[in-house]
Amino acid sequence: MRVTSSRLLQGGSLVSRVLKRRLNNASRTKKGWFSTRTLADSNEHLRRVFDDQAYFDNFTKSGAPEGAMNSLFGGNGVGLFRNRALISPQGLVDFSEESLERAKMLVSNMMAEVKTSEQGRLEYIKKLDQLSDVLCRVIDVAEFIRVSHPSQKWVDAAQRTHEIMFEYMNQLNTNVELYESLRDLLIDPAITTKLSKEEIEVGEYLRQDFERSGIHMDPNTRNNFVAITQEISLLGSHFNNDIHSLESYWCNISRSEFDKISDTVVKSEIYGYQSSSPASQNKDSGNIYIPLAGHIPYTILSKCEVESVRRKVWISLHNSPKEQIDTLNAFVKYRALLAKMLGYKSFAHYQLEHKMAKNPENVLTLLRNLQQGLISKEYGVCEEVKKLHSFKNGDDAVMTDEEILEDVKPWDREYLLAQLQSQTLKDEEPLEDISEYFSVGTIVSGLSKLFYSIYNVNLIPEATLKGETWDSNQVRKLNVFDVTSNKKLGYLYLDFWSPKVLPSHFTIVCSRKLNTDIGSESRDEMREMVQLDENEQHQLPVISLVCNLSKPQGTGVGRFTGMDSRKPTLLSLDQVDTIFHEMGHAMHSMIGKTDLHNLSGTRCVTDFVELPSVLMESFSKDPRVLCKIAKHYRTKEPLSKETLAKHQSHRVLLEESETFMQSKMAMLDQVLHNEDIINCGIKDFDSTAVYHHLESQLKVFADKWSTWHGKFPHLFSYGAVYYSYLLDRAIAEKIWHGLFKDDPWSREAGQKYKDSILKWGGTRDPWVCLADALGDERLGKGDSKAMEIIGQKV
């Protein structure tokens, strides 16, 4: 899942020469050290860096430059991600203010030069892109810190930084002079014939964003636009911050309902909470209060035979606070107002204008066709729900499919699924614990093997310096190294044990060629803020992958004493999929290297950006990949295909229903941003009524009671484009069958995929990329026929 926040139009002292030499020497030492090892040794080293805490600690100590490093920074270290300014929360705020001044100075110089010389016009797009990078360098790292950093002081500083930068970025969105200068040079053949294709692509992208930001409006309306956009951003931050909040953290049931629960262990646990529950405060002896934190509510949903108890717990667990729904209603209404101001039928029309899908009508057609296929297909949704229903009423022969879909409620799902799984297990031998073949290090090492095979790219661990990460005990740094060119592609910072964040991919720095040749920035200046390539001509992309995996067993000995190396973090098949998925985003960022940052890596259209990550899930599900990668963490025995097949068969019990549920979420995203909000009156909009009405129509596990939609983060981050996952899944299926089906380790297929899709970032029409990858010219038009082809089952 991509988390970004800051495209330009959406969104000091120098390090000593001595330090520079030491950093370069350290890099050369590590690179040479790696090259002396065999590939097998290097993969084992990579595995141990993640799986063995003591080994990692020694590696970090032995890999760091001399101790004089810290004294050069007054003991504070090199700063987060090697950005000198980010040594403290106040440093982040100072960096934002310095960057703001740097941006204003750049704008002033650009505007003076574009009006007075041809050279100023020729350099204008490069400098506009540089301006974007100056701002993104602040807002992207601030967003990462706000969401992921363990220190509240850093989080507070990130929030202040976001507010400082976002207002200025929105002012740039509606800067008429910036826009007119760009518009005029893009229609001047004397200039465009001397620009690179990438410069023109970025220029057109920025022009579109200007125009979509209401540049044609009168000054008062433009000012309102900026104010509303900023308010939407702040509402979105509040929405995401409260995504896990509940309306209440207790669910009360009657004592008679409690008595019907047969699980004595759960009853005992619930009873133990009563002294701290609302019952003790209200002296409510007639009810029992179930805590909604911890494992108890989930145990009830999967094991409790009392439907009324499951119903109450499920609704309570899915209810959002009223304030959260108010926040959702507010930003959806503001979005509708913005779309109306810009002359669009709806926010969805506004969002999709330049996406692959083109318009909401195409999206709804895609979703309806998908849902119809899932309902009607053999072994589809109806068959899956029928299997569940047989454990509810015993015999469903007298009921129609529609009646069965209506009868199986959302609070029945986990309970009936547990019954189905239990019955399935009775018919089979006990399954071996497959997670013992999937340590974190084994999977990362396996990914390096895969990337070397298909891309000729290695993942090489690098020791971090003091202050470079937010948790030196658990964050690992990888150099993504291209063997073909013998160059670094960029850096990954991986934190698999974050207590705060769902699996996420954060862009910290984008690829960009420095503008040293035109004199608008210097290497000395940039060296303090970013990590540069070997020739110091490009800033290297920096990506952070953060997951919330459980720490290895035996870690309770203290934060600074290290984790028990005897048993590493072991992964389920779902968690393996997640890491493959997020690494798909990361490799897109690394391979999609461009000279201009606005369209580098994952900065492509939103309904294309999930393709690389979704495609990686095809690799993670293929036994030819997993069985070559997986090894038992103790015995080093490989995983057998038979064992994997047995476990995978249990994962597909509700596979079609899962896809249907995702299509419901995508449909909700569309109807909350459609033209009805404008036509029926923005003032009277009620997202809960819309949600319940849609659920009633779509039927499968229909939720007509809770306010779960307040827990759906993509309603803000992916507003009107959540369908992207489903579209990109269809595209990924085509790519897999067209390139990798015969051999998922194929270098030829990997090279074709790199050359046709990954390397372009967002600088090429995605439909043209697909036409190239699949050898089908019809796709290059990107019309309704192309959408139809992609929607066809392979």
Swiss-Prot record:
GO terms for biological process: intracellular iron ion homeostasis; peptide metabolic process; protein processing involved in protein targeting to mitochondrion; protein stabilization. The active site is at residue 582. Its cofactor is Zn(2+). Binds 1 zinc ion. GO terms for molecular function: metal ion binding; metalloendopeptidase activity. Residues 1-39 form a transit peptide. It catalyses: Release of an N-terminal octapeptide as second stage of processing of some proteins imported into the mitochondrion. Pfam families: Peptidase_M3 (PF01432). It is found in: Mitochondrion matrix. Zn(2+) binds at residues 581, 585, 588. It is an enzyme of class 3 (hydrolase). PROSITE patterns: ZINC_PROTEASE (PS00142). GO terms for cellular component: mitochondrial matrix. Cleaves proteins, imported into the mitochondrion, to their mature size. While most mitochondrial precursor proteins are processed to the mature form in one step by mitochondrial processing peptidase (MPP), the sequential cleavage by MIP of an octapeptide after initial processing by MPP is a required step for a subgroup of nuclear-encoded precursor proteins destined for the matrix or the inner membrane. Belongs to the peptidase M3 family. This is Mitochondrial intermediate peptidase. The gene is OCT1.
